[in-house]
């Protein structure tokens, strides 16, 4: 976990439901933390840095190289480094979708040669970025997909959305309002996915798309709870801070 130099703002946000609220609205227990972050050369825009890594890390850390992160609709973009790190400027707004173009080469993270073909996005919230949270996004290869969904206990459904939540800080229980398949999570101190909804990373498979968003709730106080986007056949990556 990164060390954060906090300023003086720590405000609890009133709980709200998901009826009619827009994506990026705070959810129950959502708080605001402002950190003196390095905005680099982003000027009046917002700098986001983080990592894009292979779904499985149990055999050792492995980033996804040469993926392209781009602000949805055209704009700033950045290619990931060999360790999966990215760094780019995003619009100064409450939330931004970053569309990820997968690398053309096969993964260097798996024994079975395969590429990343799953449409994937990162949903970046300004309040999470400015809290100092570390964004960690994941994706899986075509070969890994069958293994992942065998563990889930149901096949991958392209008509439904996939949602990965990275919990930066204290591992917490995470839930969503939309119907979904059995959750998987990585417990603190491990890099092994297993059944559950509490950990440093939580996966909601085969989520009903519904209106195109769902309310994300984190046990206890957090930054980043609230509505998150859902897209059929697409993996959405979200990060929340749990101080």
Model-identified regions with their sequence ranges:
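Ser/Thr-rich, Pro/Gly/Ala-heavy low-complexity intrinsically disordered linkers and tails
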Residues: 1, 13-42
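Bacterial N-terminal signal peptides that target proteins for export
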Residues: 1-7
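Beta-strand-rich domain onsets/edges
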Residues: 29-47, 132-161
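Structural motif
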Residues: 34-68, 164-176
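Short, acidic Ser/Thr/Gly-rich low-complexity loop/linker segments typical of extracellular
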Residues: 63, 68-91, 180-203
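Short, low-hydrophobicity acidic/polar segments
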Residues: 76-154
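Short Pro-Gly-centered beta-turn/loop motif in secreted/extracellular proteins
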Residues: 85-105, 193-215, 219-221, 228-232
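Structured interaction patches on ligand/partner-binding surfaces of diverse proteins
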Residues: 104-136, 208-210, 217-243
């Amino acid at each position: 976990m990164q060390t954060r130099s906090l300023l003086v703002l720590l405000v609890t946000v009133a709980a709200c439901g998901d009826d009619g609220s827009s994506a990026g609205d705070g959810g129950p227990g959502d708080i605001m933390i402002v950190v003196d972050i390095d905005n680099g050369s982003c000027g009046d825009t917002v700098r986001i840095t983080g990592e894009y890594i292979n779904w499985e890390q149990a055999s050792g850390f492995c980033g996804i190289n040469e993926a392209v992160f781009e602000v949805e609709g055209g704009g700033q973009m950045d290619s990931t480094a060999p360790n999966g790190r990215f760094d780019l400027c995003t619009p100064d707004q409450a939330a931004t979708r970053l569309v990820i173009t997968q690398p053309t080469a096969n993964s260097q993270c798996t024994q079975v040669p395969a590429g990343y073909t799953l449409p994937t996005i990162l949903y970046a919230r300004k309040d999470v970025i400015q809290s100092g949270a570390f964004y960690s996004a994941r994706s899986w290869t075509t070969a890994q997909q069958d293994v992942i969904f065998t563990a889930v206990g149901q096949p991958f459904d392209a008509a439904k959305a996939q949602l990965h939540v990275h919990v930066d800080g204290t591992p917490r229980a995470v839930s969503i309002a939309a119907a979904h398949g059995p959750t998987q999570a990585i417990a603190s101190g491990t890099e092994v996915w297993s059944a559950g909804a509490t950990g440093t990373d939580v996966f909601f498979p085969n989520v009903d798309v519904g209106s195109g968003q769902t309310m994300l709730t984190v046990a206890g106080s957090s930054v980043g709870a609230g509505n998150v986007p859902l897209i059929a056949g697409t993996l959405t990556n979200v990060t929340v801070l749990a101080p």
